[in-house]
Regions:
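S-adenosylmethionine
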Residues: 1-172
Length: 172
């Protein structure tokens, strides 16, 4: 059933992000333009596509082409044809400024919220790494928040429990 695209595996907490982003929107309300800005292999992208019922367009972006290739493969297997994958390009981002109804940023983080799955993470963290990842998060927020149209919505998510990677980032 998995190989046929009948289901995808995803962490329970990850399942909360797509409904939060879509809010009260339903496919009957018309189409949406959604950006998934740190899409990776696309777990949340595929969930968004499922909830959107094939309506609208999802642009899934990442800096790693191999992850986007995996997302394309998974989307095809799942019959999610409203997903466009794009490597992050400054020219594209500039052209798309203010054009997305909804923007999801599932930012890279320390991973402190998923220690039960990756217990060795706590031994690998250094103050320097945390400073670097927070700096990356600031850059990502500054870059992708410009994609949201007036009246649109941005959801910023991490799998960290640190306020410095969550609330403090969006309050800047």
């Amino acid at each position: 059933a998995f190989k046929q695209g009948l289901f995808e595996l995803q962490d329970a907490a990850s399942q909360r992000v797509a409904p939060l982003l879509l809010g009260d929107w339903t496919p009957a309300q018309g189409s949406l333009k959604v950006a998934d800005c740190c899409a990776g292999a696309g777990g949340k992208t595929l969930h968004l596509a499922s909830l959107m019922g094939g309506k609208g367009k999802i642009v899934a972006m990442d800096i790693y082409q191999q992850k986007l290739d995996e997302l394309s493969r998974r989307a095809k297997r799942n019959g999610a044809f409203n997903i466009e994958t794009r490597p992050v390009e400054a020219k594209y981002l500039k052209r798309q400024r203010g054009s997305f109804d909804k923007v999801l940023i599932d930012a890279p983080c320390s991973g402190l919220g998923v220690l039960r799955r990756n217990p060795d993470t706590k031994w690998k963290l250094t103050p320097e790494f945390l400073d670097q990842i927070r700096s990356t998060q600031v850059q990502i927020l500054e870059q992708y928040s410009q994609l949201v149209k007036d009246g649109g919505q941005l959801v910023y998510a991490t799998c960290s429990v640190l306020p410095s990677e969550n609330q403090q980032q969006v309050q800047r």
